[in-house]
Amino acid sequence: MIIAEDALGDGADEKIPITLRGWVIWGVAALFYLYEFFVRVAPSAMAPELQETFKLSAAGLGAAIGTYYIIYSPSQLLAGSFLDRFGAKNILVPASLVCSLGCFLEVLGHDAFLLSAARFCQGLGSAFAFVGTMYLAAEWFPRSTLALLSGLTTSLGMAGAIIGNSGIAHIVEKLGWHASIIAAGVLGLVITALIYFVVPHKGRHHLEHATTVQSVRRPGIFSALRIVYSNPQSWLVGISGTALYMPLSILGALWGVEYISSVTGGNKVAAAGAVSMLYVGWLIGGPIAGWFSDRTGMRRNLLLGAGVATFITTLVVVCIHSLSVKGAYVLMLLMGFASTSQVVCFATAVEHNPKSVSGTAIAATNMMIMFLGGAGEWMFGVLLDHFSGGGVHDSYPAQAYHKAILLLPAISAIGLVAAFFLTEPSRKKLVLPADAALRVESVVWPKISLSRWLHWLRRWYPGKKDNPC
């Protein structure tokens, strides 16, 4: 994909003017990213309603909601290749449509399989949102603005998460969860139409500058994955990043509203507002962490410091059994700010691997983080069921939440150990800056040509002339 390193030459980059049309095209795609983040975290504001409707235990709900990540994680690995081959419009339109149709599917019945299928569709469509947005940014803007556009795109994603928590809680309280999800589906159809009418079939300078990527010989998909995953540092980066992301996944995406309501005694709207502070912390801290890491050259030490801060804040959450709503706001903000240095792990993964697999390193790291994040939601639900006696509950006792939340500091401790054994990567080669790599989910994937497949087939299944039998 053309947002990779060396994809655009510096001289050619200066010829790309910033136009109003470019801003509109990027803005429509970024709106899809805001929407998918909203859909991703919306279940946290309606967890009891979903459990009651689909007759699910906490573990069952966690597994059904986590289906989103199961398809999202591997799909984003291929997003770059699909965009390169078919173009942004031909990918983003069906992706947005599938994501919105997943919302309508969610309200069609009361079967748990239906909920899983709906989340599967939402995750499949969402996998292309951020990558497609940055693809268009690289097509319509100078390379020197990509870090800014990456930060702005991520900020919109965090805004979608805030709306998906506190905003939808008001709607659910007044109209019910069915109406809220239907409204989300209609909004998705509107965004699909906007993408169809606004985004062009071909980028302005795609034909001029995309050839640079193809001129560089890169390993095949499976070879690149083998290079990345055979590197112990890649696993340490992924584990450290997962530990920093886990509070956002467990509390931000699913269980936070019910947990805070339980420990504070506040209503769901107030609890959703507190959970939104997690995303505000990321919104503020992400660009700062990326800028500081690039400025000082720190990768390993910043991840280690973030691991310590996250472990302390999660430990505070465990130790405090009685908390006011205002206290929950402050604690969630601090936890979000502490864990936001997770954005640095993408640049760290790039620097710990050969330049030829930089895109693979970013995508593979993100796949690990998102997959394990979904598993974390399920594990929390299992613990919640165990400590509350099992079965389906309208609400879980505060004591069960206090015990289940021990999962967070335990995972933080594992991430802290992983960060400790990380080495500071070499800064000699050209890499993506940390803030530009924020939430980058796929960069470059080489295409496997038909001739290569035929070559493999001839090698393993020779013809009669070469077969002594």
Enumerate the predicted regions with their spans.
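Juxtamembrane intracellular "pre-TM" segments in multi-pass secondary transporters
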Residues: 9-18, 202-238, 435-461
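Extracytoplasmic gate region of multi-pass secondary transporters
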Residues: 43-45, 231-289, 373-381
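Helix-breaking motifs and short loop linkers at transmembrane-helix boundaries and internal kinks
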Residues: 55, 87, 108-114, 142, ...
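Conserved MFS/SLC helix-loop-helix module at the cytosolic interface between two early adjacent transmembrane helices
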Residues: 74-113
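Helix-to-loop junctions at the C-terminal end of transmembrane segments
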Residues: 75-87, 285-298
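Cytoplasmic membrane-interface "Motif A"-like loop-to-helix N-cap segments
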Residues: 85-95, 294-308
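Cytoplasmic helix-loop-helix junction between adjacent transmembrane helices
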Residues: 118-157
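Helix-loop-helix hairpin linking two adjacent transmembrane segments in secondary transporters
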Residues: 153-203
